[in-house]
Amino acid sequence: MPILLFLIDTSASMNQRTYLGTTYLDIAKGAVEIFMKLRARDPASRGDRYMLVTFDDPPYGVKAGWKENHATFMSELKNLQASGLTTLGHALRAAFDLLNLNRLVSGIDNYGQGRNPFFLEPSVIITITDGNKLTHSSGVAEELHLPLNSPLPGSELTKEPFRWDQRLFALVLRLPGVAVPDSEQLGSVPTDESAITQMCEVTGGRSYCVRTQRMLNQCLESLVQKVLSGVVIHFEKTGPDPPVIGEDGLVDPARPLTSFSPQPWHSCHKLIYVRPNPKTGVPVGHWPISESFWPDQNSPTLPPRSAHPVVRFSCVDCEPMVIDKLPFDKYELEPSPLTQYILERKSPHMCWQVFVNCSGKHSDVAHPFGYLKASTTLTCVNLFVMPYNYPVLLPLLDDLFKVHKLKPNLKWRQSFEMYLKSMPPYYLLPLKKALRMMGAPNLISDNMDCGLSYSVISYLKKLSQQAKIESDRLIVSVGKKPPPETGIKVKNHSNALSLAHRRDFKQLLQGITGEVPLRLIDMNFKEFAGFQIALLNKDLKPQAYRNAYDIPRRNLLDQVTRMRSNLLRTTQKLIRGQDDDSLHSIPVGQMGNYQEYLKMMPSPLREIDPDQPKRLHTFGNPFKQDKKGMMIDEADEFVTGPQNKKRGNTGDLNSGTALKRRRSMSPLLRRPQTPPIITNHVLGKGPTGTQGQQGIIKPIPLHKGAEGNNVGGTESNGERVAGTDAGDCWPGEVDGESGEPAPVEDREDAAAPDGEEEILALENCLDDRSPDHTQNCEELSPPGQEGEMEVNEGDTPAQGTIVMIPLEGSNAELRTRVIKEVRKPGRNYEAIFRLLEEVKGPVSVQRYFIHHAIKEAARFKKRMLIQQLETALEEIEDRQMLPAQINNIHSR
């Protein structure tokens, strides 16, 4: 699983423009996206892990680490801003520490136990910078320095901050600000001369000097090919040069054996490829590379190791040794001057032995652990890793199987014991596994120690626990934003004299030149300790409608016009003026989010019945209703007694235990309302006035009948008994002359035999209107008194029918608030009557509001609220009819 870490320069110099019109930071962001697209072509890229680190101060520089997903990585990449310093050293250290978080916990480094090339986390660090001077809080640095103090436990066990499976590459942007003639030459991109180049070469990478967009694309394609699984090893020649071989394959004695000048192939810092197993996807190996020290059981600590092992090779030709069933590891070398030199010799049947200095028991002795050999086809050079001091072990094992037939004698055992003593103890475990594979599992006893002291083992365990804690802490801190700066500190230098105007200038000059002892300069320039310049907050936008001083001078006239239109609402726009600007000030990352904007837009088509709740699509029957959507306000409306499940039970309709059907919420049983016609003129103006009728609606206590039942017959489910004709829509109204409730017995036609007919009758009286009424209008007045029910519909007085126009302004808002209050659960109806008192307009408007509230209360079965609203409606009717009765008396 390769790790691809992008280290992006976020210093202020990355804001410079190129000839393309984009900034360096924009080019860096685009380069990351292009690299990811190129990398996605490889099927092996499925296991890639991407990380993002910037030049911000730690720990805020880590934008995407071990736990962040691809979406977080892309979001943080798009939100990068260039506003800091070029702290390349600290950023590199933070990147290496991030990669080394889990190494002690997982045991990849295997300190003191040999270096296993097949234990690796291949990582590629790609730095994109402008190559300018390195700056930090104290000044400008000429050289690149990485901090030595690392918060990561166990960092002292390695001399360098990086590891042998981590390589650093740098894309140094040198794009000019003005377009130049296309004079670039085809070929490899040259390395840059900045300070990061040397650091790249130390880790096994390189830098690229990018001058055009075409060169950048070429570099990215090259980097994609560099993502390989392997470790970096430093190969060095030891001993004399090999004899020169002529064209005929024989040694040429005329040429000297040793060259006095160093050749490029004498020292190479290159990668060896560690191929993963095609079946498991994980590299498999058997033998480690030797440590550069002999592990001593009496040593309390481990000496620090170098990141890249120094493997020395001898140029003495030897024949490769191998026996049957003995495992060995084979690693291909990256093309280098060393591989080129070996292949040019054209000797695929000869090898050069490799070893590590100070790996033996005695510091001056080093035994080979493998050899370098060209492939048979002379296409590559391979490193074969064998058991330690394999020239001694392989003949012993060959005799064991071929001569002794797995029954060694005393002499063979003594030779084998001497070999084990000269071998580093960390080779015992892999050797025992190899012997078990070969069929000799009992040659090495189980009580042999690995070679590390108890103090070293306990120290490594303690480091592993500390590394786990530090890893969790760093993972939690990833993504945190740095605290905003309160301001810029300002020093007052206006009252201070220049050094050239000081009286002791000559003495200061002599101190600098060394003529007299240097005297410290008084640097107290009367600094204001608490004086700061406030920083501009980019997130805060000027509120032109709140503070007139935020309006630029050139926009004053335009702003006054917009404020006037916003105040007077001269336009028909639904968007207010202060919201109009914010719609066009959206971040680039949110411009494509159309779904959230569409959710706030009103529906282009109105609902068939806006008062009905939305149907919930349930599994199975699409007409099935969700019972949770039924709101029952009154506790006494529930059927408290035991339900009778027998069929054909026809009990008393008014009994509390009788079962009734629930009212269907389906809009199929109701007739759709005709939308009102929007007009700009006002109808219904009369002598009643508009303001004189306020404050007359009050909640009135519920009247009780003689038998304790509520006025008007009610069923067990709380629904009111509705008549079948239009005159009997509201059977619960109070007689206008006597003030007594109408008895239930006088209304035989009000009680329908079925609950569903009652519901339909109630809905018809609320929704249906007579054909004599004005088209697209509603009848607002309730049915007349008992004496008026015999009057024909054609002879109805003019004031019995009221035509209502659509509500505008405050009344429209009041209607919405009244509906919301009616729908709220509970028995406190004071808020409803308080809102009805605020209705402005004639009596017809107040009737309309009360009728609408009664209709909504009937949907939610609020019987008590309906009766109180009916009582309030009767009071309005009485007060309206009182002047007419007085006029009749005077006319007599």
UniProtKB/Swiss-Prot annotation:
<feature type="domain" description="VWFA">
    <location>
        <begin position="3"/>
        <end position="227"/>
    </location>
</feature>
<keyword id="KW-0539">Nucleus</keyword>
<dbReference type="Pfam" id="PF13519">
    <property type="entry name" value="VWA_2"/>
</dbReference>
<dbReference type="InterPro" id="IPR029307">
    <property type="entry name" value="INT_SG_DDX_CT_C"/>
</dbReference>
<feature type="region of interest" description="Disordered">
    <location>
        <begin position="665"/>
        <end position="692"/>
    </location>
</feature>
<dbReference type="InterPro" id="IPR051113">
    <property type="entry name" value="Integrator_subunit6"/>
</dbReference>
<dbReference type="GO" id="GO:0160240">
    <property type="term" value="P:RNA polymerase II transcription initiation surveillance"/>
</dbReference>
<dbReference type="GO" id="GO:0030674">
    <property type="term" value="F:protein-macromolecule adaptor activity"/>
</dbReference>
<dbReference type="InterPro" id="IPR002035">
    <property type="entry name" value="VWF_A"/>
</dbReference>
<dbReference type="GO" id="GO:0005634">
    <property type="term" value="C:nucleus"/>
</dbReference>
<comment type="function">
    <text>Component of the integrator complex, a multiprotein complex that terminates RNA polymerase II (Pol II) transcription in the promoter-proximal region of genes.</text>
</comment>
<dbReference type="GO" id="GO:0032039">
    <property type="term" value="C:integrator complex"/>
</dbReference>
<feature type="region of interest" description="Disordered">
    <location>
        <begin position="711"/>
        <end position="754"/>
    </location>
</feature>
<comment type="similarity">
    <text>Belongs to the Integrator subunit 6 family.</text>
</comment>
<comment type="subunit">
    <text>Component of the Integrator complex, composed of core subunits INTS1, INTS2, INTS3, INTS4, INTS5, INTS6, INTS7, INTS8, INTS9/RC74, INTS10, INTS11/CPSF3L, INTS12, INTS13, INTS14 and INTS15. The core complex associates with protein phosphatase 2A subunits PPP2CA and PPP2R1A, to form the Integrator-PP2A (INTAC) complex.</text>
</comment>
<dbReference type="GO" id="GO:0034472">
    <property type="term" value="P:snRNA 3'-end processing"/>
</dbReference>
<dbReference type="GO" id="GO:0000785">
    <property type="term" value="C:chromatin"/>
</dbReference>
<feature type="region of interest" description="Disordered">
    <location>
        <begin position="771"/>
        <end position="793"/>
    </location>
</feature>
<feature type="short sequence motif" description="Inhibitory loop">
    <location>
        <begin position="630"/>
        <end position="637"/>
    </location>
</feature>
<keyword id="KW-0158">Chromosome</keyword>
<protein>
    <recommendedName>
        <fullName>Integrator complex subunit 6</fullName>
    </recommendedName>
</protein>
<dbReference type="InterPro" id="IPR036465">
    <property type="entry name" value="vWFA_dom_sf"/>
</dbReference>
<dbReference type="Pfam" id="PF25462">
    <property type="entry name" value="Beta-barrel_INTS6"/>
</dbReference>
<dbReference type="GO" id="GO:0160232">
    <property type="term" value="C:INTAC complex"/>
</dbReference>
<dbReference type="GO" id="GO:0071168">
    <property type="term" value="P:protein localization to chromatin"/>
</dbReference>
<dbReference type="Pfam" id="PF15300">
    <property type="entry name" value="INT_SG_DDX_CT_C"/>
</dbReference>
